C-alpha cells in the first residue's frame, strides 16, 4: 500500500509544475495585451524570477559648495555689510596681536630652577611653601607685589 500512495504524490508535484507553467503562459499572454515584457533570462525553470543584478555603487564625492548659500541682495546692501564685517575683523586682529605679545616672554631660564638630578618630577608632591622659605633665607625672593604698576596706580 505504501507503494500505491507514492504515485499520487508524484502526480501532485507534476501538477504543481504545470500550474507554474500556466502562470508563465498567463504572463506571456499579458505581454501580448500591451503590458511590459519581462526578459526570459530573468525567469527560472521553476517559474520564479531571478534576483536582480546588484547595482553598481556610485563614487561618493565631497561637496564642492559651502553649507550656507549667500543670499542675493542689492549691491548697496551688500557693500554696507562688508564694511561692517571688515571693521570687526580688524578689531579681532588687533586683540589677537596683543595676546601674542603677552605670550612672548623670552626671558632666560634661571639655572637654579633646573633640577640637578635630572629626574622627572611627574607624580611627586612639591611643597612650595618650604621652597619659598628656603629662598627667603637665602635672600633670592623678590616681592612681586610692588612691581605691578597697573593695579596699584590710580
From Swiss-Prot:
Q: In what ranges is there compositional bias, type Acidic residues? A: 75-108, 140-154
Q: Which InterPro entries match?
A: Histone_chaperone_domain_CHZ (IPR019098)
Q: Which domain of life is it from?
A: Eukaryota
Q: Name one Pfam family in it.
A: CHZ
Give the principal location in a single coarse category: nucleus
Q: Where in the cell is it found?
A: Nucleus
Q: Where do the segments described as Disordered lie?
A: 1-118, 135-154
| Alphabetic keyword roster | Chaperone, Nucleus
Q: Ranges of Basic and acidic residues compositional bias? A: 1-54, 64-74
Q: Name one GO cellular component term.
A: nucleus
According to its UniProt entry, the function of this protein is described as:
Forms a chaperone-bound H2A.Z-H2B complex that acts as a source for SWR1 complex-dependent H2A to H2A.Z histone replacement in chromatin.
- Family the UniProt entry places it in: Belongs to the CHZ1 family.
Q: How does it assemble?
A: Forms a heterotrimer with H2A.Z-H2B, stabilizing the association of the histone dimer. Also, with a lower affinity, forms a heterotrimer with H2A-H2B.
Q: What is this protein called?
A: Histone H2A.Z-specific chaperone CHZ1
Q: Which organism is it from?
A: Meyerozyma guilliermondii (strain ATCC 6260 / CBS 566 / DSM 6381 / JCM 1539 / NBRC 10279 / NRRL Y-324)
